[in-house]
Amino acid sequence: MAKSADVRPVVQLRSTAGTGFTYVTRKNRRNDPDRLVVRKYDPVVREHVEFREHR
């Protein structure tokens, strides 16, 4: 089995605040074929901001 063809690949979520802070998570390609956008806490700026999937 190839890792690249995995249904749940590991993706990085990078902060849109420009701090460079990232979360690492897994996503289901069948349910979320587009890039993920999640609102999470960025400890560098101490507030909730959008995190976008980074490839």
Curated annotation (Swiss-Prot):
InterPro entries: Ribosomal_bL33, Ribosomal_bL33_CS, Ribosomal_bL33_sf, Ribosomal_zn-bd. Pfam families: Ribosomal_L33 (PF00471). SUPFAM superfamilies: Zn-binding ribosomal proteins. GO terms for molecular function: structural constituent of ribosome. GO terms for cellular component: cytosolic large ribosomal subunit. Coiled coil: none annotated. The keyword Ribonucleoprotein applies. It comes from the Bacteria. PROSITE patterns: RIBOSOMAL_L33 (PS00582). GO terms for biological process: translation. Keywords: Ribonucleoprotein, Ribosomal protein. PANTHER family: 54S RIBOSOMAL PROTEIN L39, MITOCHONDRIAL (PTHR15238), LARGE RIBOSOMAL SUBUNIT PROTEIN BL33M (PTHR15238:SF1). Belongs to the bacterial ribosomal protein bL33 family. This is Large ribosomal subunit protein bL33A. The gene is rpmG1.
